Amino acid sequence: MKKKNFGVRKDINRGKYCFLIIVDKWSIELQKEEFSLLYKLLITIDQQFSSIKKNLLDDELINLEIEQLPWYAELDGKKDDWNLRLVFESEEETRSFEMYWPIPIAKKLFYEIKKVWESMD
């Protein structure tokens, strides 16, 4: 059985950077507001993708790009298999990074982020 090589962690007691996204051999810490904005961006891209998904053929390629500052997202792939590229640039321009989630984990990581954020209510 292959070990899961990604995840999302939340620890509000950690202070400023209380969210952690882990993929393979890297991780990134996010502030609560950054994570909230990421969640909102992912919901937006999911809604747009869902609205056109039913019209796609199984092997038809799709590319969606959405910018909701400080995030930029690009979904690329097919109806049921897609990857996701995310770019973050802080409003203060003090830090920036790019994340790439390949096809095997993009969808799963998206739902983990959604689950973690929605569990905070």
Positions of the model-derived regions?
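Positively charged, low-complexity terminal tracts
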Residues: M1-D121
